[in-house]
């Protein structure tokens, strides 16, 4: 298996960014930035394992459990289990477990959801109201743009696969340390997508024989310490490793007008409705091309690609 180390571009960090400066200088650039020195409330010092266990109590939560650190959405190398929150958070903070589902060194991951996952969004104020009182969310967007606030807890070493979201978001690292690797939306041709996720699971040691184009993807990287906030614009791919047991909060908001999004989307990962319709139309067009012999199909497919490039690609060199 051919492997090559990819150089990384460090995501820039800014200290003490106000709402006004963010909206004027940062947000229009549509690039990731680490925001330091943000006022987040007492959560960064208060959220110990003992406090979390006591504050959220025995509320049952559905969690991911994996016998290996690198979670794989292709082979589904994890299972879903339900635990009382206080039991879960203590297990997630452990390295070796006396009680376990798969193995004594299994990893745990919580991604909070709404009461009815088909209809309700994740909102820390509703699912974990006591904890929500400890958090001051940077409201660098209008209230009507707010979509969800997702509470996350990860075991040390857990790695989530590379994916994109269709909403802008702040990844607020409350406790612990994370490494985040990101890829620009413009590198989508090199990421071997399956839906919203990249099939290149190991971004540190990719199999270039299987995924040769991945070598062309420009890697951006940052490390988040407790109290850091990472701005991830919509459609930027991100891969996250929890280097320590940690607690985080994702705050998603709508960059586009509300009517552009799928109203049935409770996770923030369904493509905008116009994009979904366009992809369906393209699929029908490709089906129509199958009526032609291969030589003609190839010719007209290339013309279609040129038409898309001329009409839909941005014409700058960014």
UniProtKB/Swiss-Prot annotation:
It is an enzyme of class 1 (oxidoreductase). It catalyses: 7-[(3S)-3-amino-3-carboxypropyl]wyosine(37) in tRNA(Phe) + 2-oxoglutarate + O2 = 7-(2-hydroxy-3-amino-3-carboxypropyl)wyosine(37) in tRNA(Phe) + succinate + CO2. Its EC number is 1.14.11.42. Pathway: tRNA modification; wybutosine-tRNA(Phe) biosynthesis. GO terms for biological process: wybutosine biosynthetic process. Fe cation binds at residues 163, 165, 238. GO terms for molecular function: iron ion binding; protein homodimerization activity; tRNA binding; tRNA(Phe) (7-(3-amino-3-carboxypropyl)wyosine37-C2)-hydroxylase activity. 2-oxoglutarate binds at residues 109, 169, 178. Binds 1 Fe(2+) ion per subunit. Residues 126-270 form the JmjC domain. Keywords: Dioxygenase, Iron, Metal-binding, Oxidoreductase, tRNA processing. It comes from the Eukaryota. Its cofactor is Fe(2+). It holds the Pfam family Cupin_8. tRNA hydroxylase that acts as a component of the wybutosine biosynthesis pathway. Wybutosine is a hyper modified guanosine with a tricyclic base found at the 3'-position adjacent to the anticodon of eukaryotic phenylalanine tRNA. Catalyzes the hydroxylation of 7-(a-amino-a-carboxypropyl)wyosine (yW-72) into undermodified hydroxywybutosine (OHyW*). OHyW* being further transformed into hydroxywybutosine (OHyW) by LCMT2/TYW4. OHyW is a derivative of wybutosine found in higher eukaryotes. Belongs to the TYW5 family. Homodimer. This is tRNA wybutosine-synthesizing protein 5. It comes from Gallus gallus (Chicken). The lineage of its organism: Eukaryota, Metazoa, Chordata, Craniata, Vertebrata.
